[in-house]
């Protein structure tokens, strides 16, 4: 079952009172990625975009900027709660800046960033997240990507854009 990013955000905020916006969006990204890898379906239906500051759930960002909140942690099932618990145990102690830096080194954000225009967002495809979090992308060093037939650390931004445009 797929929930709303608002529901997942409500649970993250319940578990981490005072959770800031940047940190929230990175934890949503990690929750989505780990749920895709473990369960095989999205945790929430909204798309995630690559922004300058890392992954952001576009629709949630816009709604909250307009003062529209909502979401109910009570709607989530055991699998969703387990994913969130795992993500918090793994990433919950990191700051928003730490999470931003971490996401910028990971293939899903890098692939989307390679095709986005400065100051704009580009979608982070769920398949990229699934593959990365499931470990299908081998040896991801902090400085680059390594994947069979894919980009590597020496690729220029133009080469990354061309690779992503081929639908890889």
Segments and roles (model prediction):
Residues 1-168:
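Domain-edge interaction signal
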């Amino acid at each position: 079952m797929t929930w709303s990013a608002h529901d997942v955000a409500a649970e993250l905020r319940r578990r981490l009172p005072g959770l800031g916006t940047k940190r929230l969006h990175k934890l949503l990204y990690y929750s989505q990625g780990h749920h895709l890898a473990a369960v095989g379906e999205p945790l929430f239906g909204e798309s995630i975009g690559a922004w300058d500051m890392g992954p952001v759930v576009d629709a949630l960002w816009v709604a909250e900027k307009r003062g529209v909140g909502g979401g109910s942690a009570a709607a989530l099932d055991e699998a969703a709660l387990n994913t969130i618990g795992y993500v918090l145990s793994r990433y919950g102690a990191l700051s928003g800046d730490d999470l931003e830096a971490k996401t910028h080194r990971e293939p899903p954000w890098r692939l989307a960033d390679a095709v986005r225009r400065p100051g704009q967002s580009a979608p982070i495809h769920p398949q990229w997240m699934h593959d990365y979090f499931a470990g299908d992308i081998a040896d991801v060093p902090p400085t680059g990507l390594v994947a069979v037939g894919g980009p590597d650390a020496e690729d220029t931004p133009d080469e990354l854009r061309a690779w992503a445009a081929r639908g890889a």
